[in-house]
Amino acid sequence: MMTISDIIEIIVVCALIFFPLGYLARHSLRRIRDTLRLFFAKPRYVKPAGTLRRTEKARATKK
């Protein structure tokens, strides 16, 4: 059976491990997040080919 002191000890040990690791990893988290976004997310701001290369008939007339 775990006592309250065992639970507090586990919390302190986890804090001693994960706070320094998070502090050290914070400079590389943006690069990791951007890499994952490029692999798994849909490109939102890429225009389809139709809006980049229109035919002469579809273009607006110049005034």
From Swiss-Prot:
It is a single-pass membrane protein. It is found in: Cell inner membrane. It comes from the Bacteria. GO terms for cellular component: plasma membrane. Disruption phenotype: When the bcsEFG operon is disrupted in a cellulose-synthesizing strain (a strain K12 / W3110 derivative called AR3110 with a restored, functional bcsQ gene), cellulose is no longer made. One of its GO terms (biological process) is cellulose biosynthetic process. The keyword rRNA-binding does not apply. The keyword Transmembrane applies. The chain crosses the membrane at residues 4-24. InterPro entries: Cellulose_BcsF/YhjT. Keywords: Cell inner membrane, Cell membrane, Cellulose biosynthesis, Membrane, Transmembrane, Transmembrane helix. Belongs to the BcsF family. Cellulose production is abolished in E.coli K12 / MG1655 and W3110 due to a premature stop codon in bcsQ. This is Cellulose biosynthesis protein BcsF. It comes from Escherichia coli (strain K12).
